[in-house]
């Protein structure tokens, strides 16, 4: 038992020694797709995101990058004053393609768990909180995309996440959130 524990700790330490941390800032575009009584509609909100991840090498060019991020989106058009704030936890599996000295491309895909902190319409008095009434806070998303690393210092990342779970608590209503994002990050 002691040997197995020592082996597990040694393997974990070796993975962490080869891991690379990154922090990113970027733009996001959330699209809320809903279906009520068979009628489909969608609305989009721009925003910003900040995230950090830890890219752990699994084997060769294959890695996994668990992370933690914060996204803020808003809409101030047509009299609406909508804002949403949430935490997201992605687990992206990625495959790296070295292109040239100091430049590589990686494709990634994986699940993301989203937890909504705030979802309000402040154009009404009092403000309407969607999480108190209509929507659930948790959602599961599946995402993918591409990133490029420049000189092992800068990462440019573009991705898309598809909402898999129905966020609505209202019977007969389906609501899913999708997200397009573009970020620039620093590699440690």
What are these regions (language model features)?
Residues 27-33, 56, 70-76, 83-85, ...:
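Transmembrane beta-strands of outer-membrane beta-barrel pores
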């Amino acid at each position: 038992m002691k040997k197995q524990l020592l082996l597990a700790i040694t393997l974990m330490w070796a993975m962490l020694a080869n891991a690379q941390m990154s922090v990113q800032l970027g733009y996001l575009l959330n699209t809320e797709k809903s279906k009520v009584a068979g009628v489909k509609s969608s609305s989009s909100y721009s925003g910003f995101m900040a995230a950090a991840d830890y890219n752990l090498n699994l084997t060769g060019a294959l890695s996994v990058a668990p992370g933690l991020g914060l996204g803020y989106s808003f809409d101030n058009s047509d009299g609406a004053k909508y804002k949403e704030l949430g935490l997201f936890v992605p687990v992206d599996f990625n495959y790296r393609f070295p292109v040239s000295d100091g430049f590589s491309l990686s494709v990634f895909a994986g699940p993301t768990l989203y937890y909504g902190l705030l979802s309000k319409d402040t154009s009404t008095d009092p403000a309407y909180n969607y999480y108190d009434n209509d929507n659930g806070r948790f959602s599961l998303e599946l995402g993918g995309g591409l990133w490029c690393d420049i000189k092992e210092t800068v990462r440019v990342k573009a991705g898309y996440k598809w909402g898999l779970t129905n966020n609505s608590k209202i019977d007969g209503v389906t609501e899913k959130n999708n997200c397009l994002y573009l970020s620039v990050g620093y590699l440690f």
